[in-house]
Curated annotation (Swiss-Prot):
Belongs to the metallo-dependent hydrolases superfamily. Uronate isomerase family. The keyword Isomerase applies. InterPro entries: Metal_Hydrolase (IPR032466), Uronate_isomerase (IPR003766). GO terms for molecular function: glucuronate isomerase activity. Pathway: Carbohydrate metabolism; pentose and glucuronate interconversion. Gene3D superfamilies: Metal-dependent hydrolases (3.20.20.140), uronate isomerase, domain 2, chain A (1.10.2020.10). SUPFAM superfamilies: Metallo-dependent hydrolases. This is Uronate isomerase. Transmembrane segments: none annotated. Keywords: Isomerase. It holds the Pfam family UxaC.
């Protein structure tokens, strides 16, 4: 029997152990999609206590606490931070089988040297020990990033964001690359009651008077250029329902004017607007050499009562089960026909879509860029041992796992980088298992290179973040 969380955690063969410890363990991290605050990074935010660092904004933990019968006062409500921590400590032993149990103890060990298993009995002792450390030098937001051997962080930013903290971090010369990610969801959500207000904000941010759909597109392009100047090389789209409708820019011009004049739109008109706008964005990304991420099939804000009380991103989302194959194919094909399909990473929250995504990705590889079309890593509810394994097994069966760009945190917490360790261990265990079964040769040179690629080097090559340094160097010269 193995000891819990020992050096060989999740590594179930000698080959897996060798691959992890010799090839994966010490590689830098490229976290190409997260929800960290660039302001917190710039200010090297410190934390009053472990509750602030751990439980503020973590809807994974909130869901578990609610499922354990913890009242909302002790989840997101007005209970003290100490009482919220006690409620979490009471919940932790009940999370066995859930990755939260592993992540919790990995984070305690890696960042705070706490070997004990958190529970209700030792909660006070751990509270005091961890909080003492948090008051020491070297436990701010930047410190957690640097301790985790992170090379690049890509945040999630709205087109109207000023990017002032990315700029300040670059000017200051912070050793970790902190780059913006372009997330234009509000610009495509024409059905939202606040769309008109957002258009006015976009006009202000871009310094373009938006009187027409063409003006709207010009404003988005201006913001894309602004993001590009600030080092952005990645876009991201949350697509809860994958849709597609043939249309023309002239027709969408009419739809845009109708919406801005206060008239309701039909469902087909909404889809036509999204389709045409998305195609324009894809073209713009391709022109600038960006990668495009599509996060598909989330069913959000399901509990109306709690949404009205707490707002979005509070733990009341689920997997959607909309069909994605045909509309996604038509979007990709339209961009491909126009020679405007950027490097693309496809994620679905529903694991039944794994095979769909892997096969669709294979339909649009270009024979030039290794792994141009990526089946993205297991996401959100699939960010588990089972989910990660299934995603990698599907990818390896249908595509080239050797060209996979690997893991990201998708997190709002500065303690989440242990998820990269978790992923790397699972990756090495999968490949090690193939070796043990005689399904692949025991060729450490080959397998080690593949492990290094998936863990770090493929993402570095795929995104080419070094271009940012060249861009900024040129801007200084000019």
């Amino acid at each position: 029997m193995k000891a819990f969380l020992n050096e060989q955690f999740l590594l179930n063969s000698p080959t897996a152990e060798k691959l992890y410890h010799e090839f994966a363990k010490d590689l830098p991290i490229i976290d190409y999609h997260c929800h960290l605050s660039p302001k917190d990074i710039y200010e090297n935010k410190t934390f009053r206590n472990i509750t602030e660092a751990w439980l503020y904004g973590d809807h994974y933990k909130w869901r578990a606490m609610r499922a354990n019968g913890i009242p909302e006062t002790h989840v997101t409500g007005d209970a003290s931070d100490y009482d919220k921590f006690l409620a979490w400590a009471k919940t932790v032993p009940m999370t066995i089988g859930n990755p939260l149990y592993h992540w919790t103890h990995l984070e305690l060990r890696r960042y705070f040297e706490v070997q004990d298993l958190l529970n209700e009995k030792n909660a006070d002792t751990i509270w005091q020990k961890v909080n003492e450390k948090l008051q020491e030098e070297g436990f701010g937001a930047r410190d957690f990033i640097m301790k985790s051997n992170v090379e690049t962080v890509v945040t999630t930013d709205d087109p109207i964001d000023s990017l002032q903290y990315h700029q300040k971090l670059r000017e200051e010369g912070f050793s970790v690359q902190v780059l913006p990610g372009f997330r234009p969801d509000k610009a495509l959500d024409i059905a939202n009651d606040l769309f008109e207000k957002y258009v006015h904000e976009l006009a202000e941010a871009s310094a373009i008077s938006i009187q027409s759909y063409q003006d709207f597109l010009n404003a988005l392009r201006a913001r894309i250029d602004f993001f590009h100047e600030h080092g952005c090389l990645i876009s991201d789209h949350a697509i809860n329902e994958m849709t597609y409708e043939e249309t023309t820019q002239e027709e969408v011009e009419t739809i845009f004017h109708k919406r801005m004049s206060g008239y309701p739109l039909t469902e087909k008109e909404k889809i036509k607007f999204k389709t045409e706008t998305f195609i324009m964005l894809g073209q713009a990304y391709c022109e600038r050499g960006w990668a495009m991420q599509l996060h598909i099939n989330a069913l959000r804000n399901n509990n109306t009562k709690m949404f009205e009380r707490l707002g979005p991103d509070t733990g009341y989302d689920a997997m959607n089960d909309e069909d994605i194959a045909k509309p996604l194919c038509r979007i990709l094909d339209r961009l491909e026909q126009e020679d405007a399909l950027p490097n693309t990473i496809l994620y679905s929250l529903n694991p039944r879509d794994n095979v769909v995504i892997s096969t669709l990705a294979g339909s649009f590889q270009d024979g030039k860029t290794p792994g141009k079309m990526q089946h993205g890593t297991a996401w959100w509810f699939n960010d588990t041992k089972q989910g990660m394994t299934e995603q990698m097994m599907t990818l390896s069966s249908i595509g080239l796992i050797s060209r996979f760009i690997g893991m990201l945190t998708d997190s709002r917490s500065f303690l989440s980088y242990t998820r990269h360790e978790y992923f790397r261990r699972l990756l090495c265990d999968i490949i090690g298992d193939w070796v043990e079964k005689g399904e692949v040769p025991y060729d450490l040179e080959l397998l080690g290179e593949i492990v290094k690629g998936i863990s770090y080097e493929n993402a570095k090559q795929y995104f080419q973040f070094d271009r940012v340094k060249q861009l900024h160097h040129q801007s200084k010269i000019t």
